Amino acid sequence: MGRRDSGRAVAQRYRGVTRGVTVIACLMVVCACVGLCDATGQKRHSWEAPGCHLVGHTRVVRIPDCVPFQITTNACRGFCVSYAIPSPYQTLVYNPNHIITSRAACCDIIDTLDIPVQVTCVDGVREIVFKSARSCACSICRRE
């Protein structure tokens, strides 16, 4: 009876291991299908790398009584470092309520340029000026 019991224990362990391997294999397939795992290690877009990057942004503009038009301007896209840590002792001595110290940077437009566009409207041609990002950088996050 001892051999039969140990055989069952081995079979149960084997089933548990194969289930674990199956789950891992399924996760790898899902990950690959979704595109989260890139075997080459390369990013599909420049903005997927850490930092703040200049990217083109195309949209259709509709102005009442004017012909709709498409325009491409530059925007900033990416991600910057942010974190929160328990406040250092010196900070707590100065302000006991300041328990957490946070640092954050946001992807932001640093400089812009004007893009003039001639738009055909019912009352004639109008010149409308759009802003386009010239440069981008990680900077202090602001509330607006």
UniProtKB/Swiss-Prot annotation:
PANTHER family: GLYCOPROTEIN HORMONE ALPHA-2. Expressed by the venom duct. Belongs to the glycoprotein hormones subunit alpha family. Residues 1-41 form the signal peptide. The keyword Zinc-finger does not apply. InterPro entries: Cystine-knot_cytokine, Glyco_Hormone_Alpha. This is Thyrostimulin alpha-2 subunit. One of its GO terms (cellular component) is extracellular space. It comes from Conus victoriae (Queen Victoria cone). Disulfide bonds join C52-C107, C66-C121, C76-C136, C80-C138. It comes from the Eukaryota. Transmembrane segments: none annotated. GO terms for biological process: cell surface receptor signaling pathway. Keywords: Disulfide bond, Hormone, Secreted, Signal, Toxin. It is found in: Secreted.
